[in-house]
Amino acid sequence: MPRIIGIDIPAKKKLKISLTYIYGIGPALSEEIIAKLQLNPEARAVELTEEEIGRLNSLLQSEYVVEGDLRRRVQSDIKRLISIHAYRGQRHRLSLPVRGQRTKTNSRTRKGKRKTVAGKKK
Protein backbone atom coordinates (compact mmCIF):
# COMPACT_ATOMS: atom_id res chain seq x y z
CA MET A 1 0.00 0.00 0.00
CA PRO A 2 1.56 3.30 -1.06
CA ARG A 3 1.59 5.98 1.63
CA ILE A 4 0.61 9.47 0.50
CA ILE A 5 0.65 12.34 3.04
CA GLY A 6 0.50 9.81 5.85
CA ILE A 7 -2.48 7.86 4.47
CA ASP A 8 -2.30 4.31 3.14
CA ILE A 9 -4.13 4.23 -0.18
CA PRO A 10 -5.37 0.95 -1.70
CA ALA A 11 -2.66 -0.53 -3.90
CA LYS A 12 -4.78 -2.63 -6.22
CA LYS A 13 -7.28 0.06 -7.22
CA LYS A 14 -6.75 2.49 -10.06
CA LEU A 15 -5.01 5.72 -9.12
CA LYS A 16 -8.12 7.85 -9.72
CA ILE A 17 -10.08 5.77 -7.18
CA SER A 18 -7.18 5.34 -4.72
CA LEU A 19 -6.70 9.09 -4.30
CA THR A 20 -10.34 9.49 -3.22
CA TYR A 21 -9.47 7.59 0.00
CA ILE A 22 -7.77 10.80 1.16
CA TYR A 23 -10.21 13.06 3.05
CA GLY A 24 -10.93 16.12 0.92
CA ILE A 25 -10.21 14.54 -2.46
CA GLY A 26 -13.17 13.44 -4.56
CA PRO A 27 -13.32 12.04 -8.10
CA ALA A 28 -13.06 15.43 -9.84
CA LEU A 29 -10.13 16.65 -7.75
CA SER A 30 -8.44 13.28 -8.18
CA GLU A 31 -8.61 13.64 -11.98
CA GLU A 32 -7.29 17.22 -11.73
CA ILE A 33 -4.30 16.11 -9.64
CA ILE A 34 -3.51 13.22 -12.01
CA ALA A 35 -3.65 15.56 -15.02
CA LYS A 36 -1.48 18.18 -13.28
CA LEU A 37 1.22 15.59 -12.51
CA GLN A 38 0.77 13.87 -15.91
CA LEU A 39 0.25 10.45 -14.36
CA ASN A 40 -1.58 7.56 -16.01
CA PRO A 41 -5.12 7.48 -14.51
CA GLU A 42 -5.52 3.82 -15.49
CA ALA A 43 -2.37 2.77 -13.60
CA ARG A 44 -2.74 1.03 -10.26
CA ALA A 45 -1.49 2.79 -7.14
CA VAL A 46 1.05 0.02 -6.53
CA GLU A 47 2.70 0.85 -9.90
CA LEU A 48 3.71 4.37 -8.77
CA THR A 49 7.45 5.00 -8.55
CA GLU A 50 9.05 6.61 -5.49
CA GLU A 51 9.61 9.77 -7.55
CA GLU A 52 5.92 9.96 -8.53
CA ILE A 53 4.84 9.42 -4.91
CA GLY A 54 7.19 12.22 -3.86
CA ARG A 55 5.74 14.59 -6.48
CA LEU A 56 2.22 13.66 -5.38
CA ASN A 57 3.08 14.29 -1.71
CA SER A 58 4.66 17.68 -2.39
CA LEU A 59 1.73 18.81 -4.60
CA LEU A 60 -0.89 17.79 -2.01
CA GLN A 61 0.98 19.49 0.84
CA SER A 62 1.61 22.72 -1.05
CA GLU A 63 -1.58 23.33 -3.04
CA TYR A 64 -4.48 21.50 -1.38
CA VAL A 65 -6.09 21.47 2.06
CA VAL A 66 -6.70 17.80 2.87
CA GLU A 67 -6.97 15.39 5.82
CA GLY A 68 -6.28 16.85 9.28
CA ASP A 69 -5.98 20.47 8.12
CA LEU A 70 -9.33 20.27 6.32
CA ARG A 71 -11.03 18.59 9.29
CA ARG A 72 -9.67 21.33 11.60
CA ARG A 73 -10.82 24.05 9.21
CA VAL A 74 -14.38 22.63 9.04
CA GLN A 75 -14.54 22.34 12.85
CA SER A 76 -13.24 25.88 13.34
CA ASP A 77 -15.79 27.20 10.82
CA ILE A 78 -18.60 25.52 12.77
CA LYS A 79 -17.25 26.89 16.08
CA ARG A 80 -17.09 30.37 14.54
CA LEU A 81 -20.72 30.14 13.38
CA ILE A 82 -21.75 29.08 16.88
CA SER A 83 -19.75 31.84 18.58
CA ILE A 84 -21.21 34.64 16.42
CA HIS A 85 -24.72 33.28 17.07
CA ALA A 86 -25.44 32.80 13.37
CA TYR A 87 -28.61 30.86 12.49
CA ARG A 88 -26.50 28.06 11.01
CA GLY A 89 -24.42 27.97 14.19
CA GLN A 90 -27.53 27.61 16.34
CA ARG A 91 -28.74 24.71 14.16
CA HIS A 92 -25.35 23.01 14.62
CA ARG A 93 -25.50 23.61 18.38
CA LEU A 94 -28.99 22.07 18.63
CA SER A 95 -28.06 19.14 16.36
CA LEU A 96 -30.75 20.01 13.84
CA PRO A 97 -30.52 20.13 10.03
CA VAL A 98 -28.61 23.22 8.92
CA ARG A 99 -29.72 23.62 5.32
CA GLY A 100 -33.44 24.16 5.60
CA GLN A 101 -34.73 20.59 5.58
CA ARG A 102 -38.03 19.79 7.27
CA THR A 103 -37.94 18.60 10.87
CA LYS A 104 -41.55 17.69 11.71
CA THR A 105 -40.86 14.28 10.20
CA ASN A 106 -37.54 12.88 9.01
CA SER A 107 -34.12 14.35 10.00
CA ARG A 108 -33.54 11.30 12.21
CA THR A 109 -29.86 11.13 11.28
CA ARG A 110 -29.22 14.61 12.63
CA LYS A 111 -31.50 14.36 15.69
CA GLY A 112 -30.40 10.88 16.76
CA LYS A 113 -32.48 8.01 18.12
CA ARG A 114 -36.14 8.74 18.75
CA LYS A 115 -37.06 9.91 22.26
CA THR A 116 -40.52 8.71 23.25
CA VAL A 117 -42.85 11.35 24.70
CA ALA A 118 -46.08 10.52 26.55
CA GLY A 119 -49.19 10.76 24.34
CA LYS A 120 -52.11 13.12 24.78
CA LYS A 121 -54.92 12.03 27.16
CA LYS A 122 -58.45 12.07 25.72
Curated annotation (Swiss-Prot):
InterPro entries attached to this UniProt entry: Rbsml_uS13_C, Ribosomal_uS13, Ribosomal_uS13-like_H2TH, Ribosomal_uS13_bac-type, Ribosomal_uS13_CS
Region annotated Disordered, chain positions: 93-122
Segments of skewed composition (Basic residues): 101-122
HAMAP family listed in its UniProt record: Ribosomal_uS13
Lineage: Bacteria, Pseudomonadati, Chlamydiota, Chlamydiia, Chlamydiales
PANTHER family: 30S RIBOSOMAL PROTEIN S13/40S RIBOSOMAL PROTEIN S18, SMALL RIBOSOMAL SUBUNIT PROTEIN US13M
SUPFAM superfamilies: S13-like H2TH domain
Family: Belongs to the universal ribosomal protein uS13 family.
GO molecular function term, any single one: tRNA binding
GO biological process entries: translation
Name of the encoding gene: rpsM
Keyword presence, tRNA-binding: yes
Record key words, sorted: Ribonucleoprotein, Ribosomal protein, RNA-binding, rRNA-binding, tRNA-binding
Superkingdom of source: Bacteria
Main function: Located at the top of the head of the 30S subunit, it contacts several helices of the 16S rRNA. In the 70S ribosome it contacts the 23S rRNA (bridge B1a) and protein L5 of the 50S subunit (bridge B1b), connecting the 2 subunits; these bridges are implicated in subunit movement. Contacts the tRNAs in the A and P-sites.
Gene3D superfamilies named among the record's database cross-references: 1.10.8.50, 30s ribosomal protein s13, domain 2 (4.10.910.10)
Assembly: Part of the 30S ribosomal subunit. Forms a loose heterodimer with protein S19. Forms two bridges to the 50S subunit in the 70S ribosome.
Gene Ontology cellular component terms for the protein in this record: cytosol; small ribosomal subunit
Name listed for the protein in its UniProt record: Small ribosomal subunit protein uS13
